[in-house]
Amino acid sequence: MLPAGGEAIHSSETHAGLYWVHDAPLLRYLGVSTVKPVFKPCFYSHQDARAQLDAIASNPRGANANRVSVLLGNNAFPQTRTVTHTLWAMLGILPAGQVQRPHRHQSIALDFAVACQPGCYTMIGTELDENGMIRNGHRDC
């Protein structure tokens, strides 16, 4: 069930990946329901996203960046550049063998590994060591 009471049917004739994120859990937690849709859902095509990521990765400044990623936004929220009024989303790449420097989130972060080899993980922790890496971290596979 979509937050505004709609129904969704998904089909594909080839390989497809779907990462569907919405505010329904938040609404359920708050004990509220929607009356009508307020904004339209967003769709980000693989081709467009990949083209943006490739452009960033091939830029000399992008090669030294902590993250090669694209902020996914909804045209309904130009000031916040968010997917919904409460949800941020980014799509990024991390080349094989590279380690992403630790960074902090001010809100919820969901990692979705689309393609990776066994052993790929997210390290979670509350302290950094003298080299700026996570001290006593927890691996989240």
Q: Which ranges hold each PLM region?
A:
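Short histidine-centered beta-strand/loop micro-motifs
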Residues: S11, R81, V99-H105, F112
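Ligand-binding loop in jelly-roll beta-barrel domains
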Residues: L2-V32
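A short beta-strand-loop-beta hairpin characteristic of the jelly-roll/cupin
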Residues: M1-A4, D111-C141
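Short, structured patches in soluble enzyme cores that scaffold and shape functional sites
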Residues: W20-D23, I93, V114
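Conserved short histidine dyad/triad with adjacent acidic residue
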Residues: F77, W88-H105
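A short, N-terminal "cap"/entry segment at the start of jelly-roll beta-barrel domains
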Residues: H15, R28-M90
